[in-house]
Amino acid sequence: LHSELGLNNGDERSARLQARLTDHTFAVARALHRQADVTPVLAVSGLGPGNARRWGRQQGIDTVRLQGEGNLGTRIRRQLQPLRRHRIPALVVGSDLPDVHQRDLLMALENLQSHDLVLGPAADGGYWLIALSADLMQTPARWPLAGIPWGSDDVCRCTLEYAHRFNLSVALLRQQQDLDHLRDLNRWQGCRS
């Protein structure tokens, strides 16, 4: 989002927008932490370890991890691996969602009581949330992260096909508009007018 908007809109405006989106996501995560037994983890790219930890502390997030290299599936897998030993479900949510609310994440947690996988479809064909049940977290070979055409409009569809192949039960949340590109911002602003 930042680089795309920077090319078309000026770096300062895109940085302010990304900061607002990220602050909103932090606020939702903190609210969820207060209401449910959920520990937010901040996965960061573009910062060194010290700056990432400082930023997390400033936002009230104690656990901060670097995303590392690789495609989105590789980076998500890297964040999920350390959680396996806790035998808990995991939610991964993007920070480019102007309309995400605590109730969306609570709905994901509720759906994990009876489903292996929860997806929040994005209007562009991706997803804004992926959540894995505690049982699914114990079998990384079944995680729907490999062989997905990341960055395409087929991400959600291919993830659902993967889930079907592995007999994973899936719940879908409401579709949301994430802001990956300038056209997404224009579309979102048009819907808000």
Report each predicted region and the residues it spans:
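Conserved donor-nucleotide/metal-binding helix-loop-beta segment in metal-dependent transferases, i.e.
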Residues: 100-125
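Short, glycine-/small-residue-rich phosphate/pyrophosphate-handling segment
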Residues: 137-162
